[in-house]
């Protein structure tokens, strides 16, 4: 498979009045052409910060990439100037944000907002840009695009606004599309339509998608590969089948176990006890150790290396170490 993006040992920190928050700590993954790569995890785990780092949209005065590389077309995005990133952002790498209403300019028509990207990045004439806008609105399922492009965002429903935001992200035919919680603000019926739209667009354009979400139901429908993120680190990466049917990390198992089951009457929810670690002063060992039911002494002291279970499945957990069974049996486990 053709690799289109490589994130290597990414570290991002935020400077606050209370100290330095280590939001992302050593994140690494590759993205391949035409795939949907989902990053899942609870709020504050660093998944959105990772996507903002790729887009070059981190707050300039408080956030900083302190280490690592983001390689795209033989360029390290972390080393590019603002001017160079503006040439890539929107043209080669686009992003869909959570709330379509705040992502659109209420004072400009939909046609003007979609056409602006073509005029800037593709240097098209207004006539050619209008033709492209009509085609894109049709692709994302906007009825009567010739009339709708003259309208303003407030004249569209929430689902239609999200379709317009998707059209805006795809208008310049990017190589990578980052979707940050694209269905959070939508009801279940509209959510299903948008997810089906994602599948259709990917079939037609072969765009690579990074999906940022906490909704495992969404992941199960559209993702090819899944990364489970916790406290700024990758806990487990695998195919959708690996993660849903053969989870190895205790946090991944906890996430799946906490999802309500509609097929089991009266089934109790299984919460994950405890709280995430303080990222002002993260622990030296596994960040999930304090909440882990299989905790060992080594988990508190040293961060586990990556265990490769297959070509598609990697886990960062001491339980994958060959010595783990002996450690538990010898009484190294903590209560």
Swiss-Prot record:
Keywords: ATP-binding, Cell membrane, Membrane, Nucleotide-binding, Peptide transport, Protein transport, Sporulation, Translocase, Transport
Coiled coil: none
A GO biological process held by the record: protein transport
List of residues binding ATP: 41-48
GO molecular function ontology, one term from the record: ATP binding
Location(s) in or outside the cell: Cell membrane
Span of domain ABC transporter: 7-256
Catalyzed reactions: a dipeptide(out) + ATP + H2O = a dipeptide(in) + ADP + phosphate + H(+)
A Gene Ontology term for the protein's cellular component: plasma membrane
Described purpose of this protein according to its UniProt entry: Probably part of the ABC transporter DppBCDE involved in dipeptide transport. Responsible for energy coupling to the transport system.
Protein name, as recorded: Dipeptide transport ATP-binding protein DppD
Organism whose genome encodes this protein: Bacillus subtilis (strain 168)
Gene designation: dppD
């Amino acid at each position: 498979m053709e690799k289109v993006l490589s994130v290597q040992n990414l570290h991002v920190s935020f400077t606050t009045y209370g100290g330095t928050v280590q939001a992302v700590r050593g994140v690494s993954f590759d993205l391949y052409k035409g795939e949907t790569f989902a990053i899942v995890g609870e709020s504050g785990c660093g998944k959105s910060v990772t996507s903002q780092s790729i887009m070059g949209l981190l707050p300039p005065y408080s956030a900083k990439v302190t280490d690592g590389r983001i390689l795209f077309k033989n360029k390290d995005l972390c080393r590019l100037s603002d001017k160079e990133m503006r040439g890539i952002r929107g043209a080669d790498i686009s992003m869909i944000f959570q709330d379509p209403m705040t992502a659109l300019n209420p004072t400009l028509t939909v046609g003007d907002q979609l056409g602006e990207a073509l005029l800037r990045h593709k240097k098209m004439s207004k006539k050619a840009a209008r033709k492209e806008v009509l085609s894109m609105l049709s692709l994302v399922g906007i009825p009567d695009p010739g009339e709708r492009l003259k309208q303003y965002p407030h004249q569209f429903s929430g689902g239609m606004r999200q379709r317009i935001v998707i059209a805006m992200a795809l208008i310049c035919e990017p190589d990578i599309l980052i979707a940050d919680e694209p269905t959070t603000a939508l009801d279940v019926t509209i959510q299903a339509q948008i997810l089906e739209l994602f599948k259709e667009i990917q079939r037609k354009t072969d765009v690579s998608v990074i999906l940022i979400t906490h909704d495992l139901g969404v992941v199960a429908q559209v993702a090819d590969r899944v990364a489970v993120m916790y406290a700024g680190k990758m806990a487990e990466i695998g195919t959708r089948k690996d993660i849903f049917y053969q989870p190895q990390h205790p946090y991944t198992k906890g996430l799946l176990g906490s999802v309500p089951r509609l097929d089991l009457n009266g089934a109790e929810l299984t919460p994950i006890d405890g709280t995430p670690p303080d990222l002002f002063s993260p622990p030296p060992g596994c960040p999930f150790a304090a909440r882990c039911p299989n905790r060992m002494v080594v988990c508190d002291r040293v961060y586990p290396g990556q265990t490769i279970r297959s070509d598609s499945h990697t886990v960062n957990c001491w339980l994958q170490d060959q010595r783990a069974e002996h450690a538990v049996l010898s009484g190294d486990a903590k209560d």
